Design a protein with these regions (language model features):
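Canonical positions in the second alpha-helix
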Residues: 36, 69-70, 103-104, 137-138, ...
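Terminal, low-structured helical/coil segments at or just beyond the last alpha-helical repeat
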Residues: 1-12, 16, 246-272
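Conserved alpha-helical positions within TPR/SEL1-like repeat arrays
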Residues: 14-22, 34, 45-56, 79-90, ...
Length: 272
């Protein structure tokens, strides 16, 4: 008979915590990570994953504290450096985030996630050429990174390099037929290249699966307008506005494909 239960083993606590992380239960995991570090303050695995859990809960400053503790123990922990940068970006410290992404790359020039994250941040800062350079580097290191390939297509589109963007999304969709975002953006790039009939075929297929998707409905309105299917374009634009008036109105006012609707009172009523 056992009268006094001993402390739970650190390894067992850590195993349980990581199980919660896999189940996307960061709150439960955090309680266990705290127990681990109470027993073993220098346990970098617990400290690092505690930081990841806090990031998931959007407690970014607390996450930074965890990553700093890891880096105090191991200044060359590239994952901690990279995730510290993510936390900094989330709190709006873009300068600090870029500094730490660069630090991660300097620590390990083959660490693809830092190039990818730095590319995404450059894109958000509207520095699209720098974004593309970083995404290209991420793909050079990890050619199978679907996230980097997809984001590369997005940036190419923003740079008006639509043939390259289309090729990018086609390749992703060919390898990953369930990647609906790539399929959607394939349609968008076809529209940008004036291939509206083919774009509409894609949008129709998507609406069979996601009939209420406002982005697809709006994209279909654009292509119908470009093909002078005015009544259909007006109808679809109205349907999109019912779902998200503020956003769709903003897009419609700036939309080049709606130039031929500017004299239509129905269009003006929608965007008024």
């Amino acid at each position: 008979m056992i009268f006094f239960a001993g402390k739970e083993k650190t390894e067992d606590l850590l195993y349980q915590a990581m199980s919660f992380m896999e189940k996307r239960q960061p709150k439960a995991a955090i309680q266990l990570f705290k127990k681990v570090t109470k027993q073993d303050p220098n346990n970098t695995i617990a400290l690092y994953n505690h930081g990841l859990a806090l990031n998931q809960l959007k407690k970014y400053q607390d996450a930074i504290t965890c990553f700093d503790k890891v880096l105090d123990l191991n200044p060359k922990d590239v994952s901690a450096i990279n995730n510290r940068a993510i936390s900094l970006a989330e709190v709006g410290n873009t300068e600090g985030a870029l500094e730490y992404y660069t630090k991660a790359i300097e620590t390990d020039p083959k660490y693809a996630p830092a190039y990818y994250n730095r590319g995404v941040l450059y894109d958000k800062l509207l520095q699209h050429d720098e974004a593309l350079d970083n995404l290209d580097q991420a793909l050079k290191i990890d050619s199978g990174n679907v996230y980097a390939a997809f984001y590369r297509g997005i940036v190419l589109g923003k740079l008006d390099r639509h043939e390259e963007a289309l090729n990018c999304f086609e390749n992703i969709y060919k390898k990953h037929p369930k990647h609906m975002d790539a399929f959607f953006h394939k349609g968008i790039e076809m529209a940008e290249l004036g291939k509206h009939e083919k774009a509409l075929e894609i949008f129709d297929k998507l609406l069979q699966i996601h009939k209420d998707n406002v982005n697809v409905i709006y994209a279909k309105a654009r292509s119908n307008a470009a093909l002078d299917n005015i009544d259909e374009a007006i109808y679809l634009l109205g349907q999109a506005m019912k779902k998200d008036r503020k956003t769709i109105k903003k897009w419609a006012i700036q939309e080049k494909f709606f130039d031929n609707l500017l004299d239509d009172p129905r269009f003006n009523k929608l965007v008024k």
